[in-house]
């Protein structure tokens, strides 16, 4: 990963974290890794655990970012979520939501909960 892409990714994750906090989420973990899988942000609100992918777009204003969630991405997120839950037994009885926080320099944050 290029240094520029890493900086943009970190910036996007900070913006997304602030956004999630503003709508009542508590951030539990950022950049959680399990085997070869990663979840950008894990948060909780009420009795729901949110596993969120963050996408930072500079262009593609008409692009629907939900299409980035192909089968392979869903599989990796599920695997990482299972790993997180196996390490955090007290959270296993919570509902789970897989989400996307899309950040566009022109549109701001768009939040897509319950993608799959």
Swiss-Prot record:
Any one Pfam family match given in the protein's UniProt record, by short name: UPF0102
* Stored InterPro entries: Restrct_endonuc-II-like (IPR011335), tRNA_endonuc-like_dom_sf (IPR011856), UPF0102_YraN-like (IPR003509)
Q: Give one GO molecular function term.
A: nucleic acid binding
| NCBIfam families, per database record | PRK12497.4-3 (NF009157)
What family does the database annotate? Belongs to the UPF0102 family.
Q: What is this protein called?
A: UPF0102 protein LBJ_1427
Q: Which organism is it from?
A: Leptospira borgpetersenii serovar Hardjo-bovis (strain JB197)
